[in-house]
Regions:
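Asparagine-centered strand-capping/turn motif at beta-strand->loop junctions
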Residues: 59-66
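Terminal connector regions
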Residues: 110-153
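N-terminal signal peptide c-region/cleavage motif recognized by signal peptidases
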Residues: 27-31
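Intrinsically disordered, low-complexity Pro/Gly/Ser/Thr-rich segments with frequent PxxP/GP/PP motifs
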Residues: 79-117
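Short acidic/proline- and small/hydrophobic-mixed sequence motifs that coincide with surface turns
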Residues: 68-71
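Bacterial N-terminal signal peptides that target proteins for export
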Residues: 2-18
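Low-complexity, acidic Ser/Thr/Pro/Gly-rich terminal tails and inter-domain linkers that flank the onset
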Residues: 34-54, 58, 147-151
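Hydrophobic beta-strand segments
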Residues: 74-76
Length: 153
């Protein structure tokens, strides 16, 4: 039998108090509706180093979104020194715990570090976690570079 809502005039005072307490508890339980993400993902292009495979690119990433990110991945475009797109690839930054800074390194096979003139964050291909919207990982991304290579979105 489906449950029915009763008009408040039919509830006793104790019943109304019990309903108010239950509603308050439900709103504070994990998994209840959460506030939208308000912070940022700070992504720094830290270094490009020659490696046995080609070029190793290092990023420092800080999750300041106010919640854990179960998975973040970005589509990256590499441009040569002449400004031409050399390749598109997806870099999976995996899990990013809230208020944690991590270093992520990626080996780019057959890439010449010295030939890379610009790294563009084209889009977020994955943005997963409780309370996150699909576009949060790109909209709230702050990109900086310690390298001579131009980096941004």
């Amino acid at each position: 039998m489906p449950s029915r809502l009763l008009p408040s005039s039919l509830l006793s005072t104790a019943g109304r108090i019990a309903l108010a307490v239950a509603g308050t508890l439900a709103a504070t339980l994990p998994g209840a509706a959460q506030e939208p993400a308000t912070g940022a993902i700070k992504l720094e292009l830290n270094a490009l180093q020659k490696s046995e495979k080609g070029c190793r690119i290092a990023f420092v990433v800080e999750n300041a979104m106010g919640r854990d990110i179960a998975r973040a991945a970005y589509e990256i475009a590499l441009f040569n020194k002449e400004g031409l797109v050399d390749r598109l690839l997806v870099l999976d930054f995996q899990e990013l715990p809230n208020e944690k800074t991590k270093v992520r390194r990626f080996d780019l096979a057959d890439a010449d570090c010295d030939a890379i003139g610009r790294v563009l964050i084209n889009d977020a291909s994955a943005c997963e976690g409780d309370g996150l919207e699909p576009g949060d990982c790109i909209a709230r991304l702050e990109a900086t570079s310690r390298s001579t290579v131009t980096f941004g979105k």
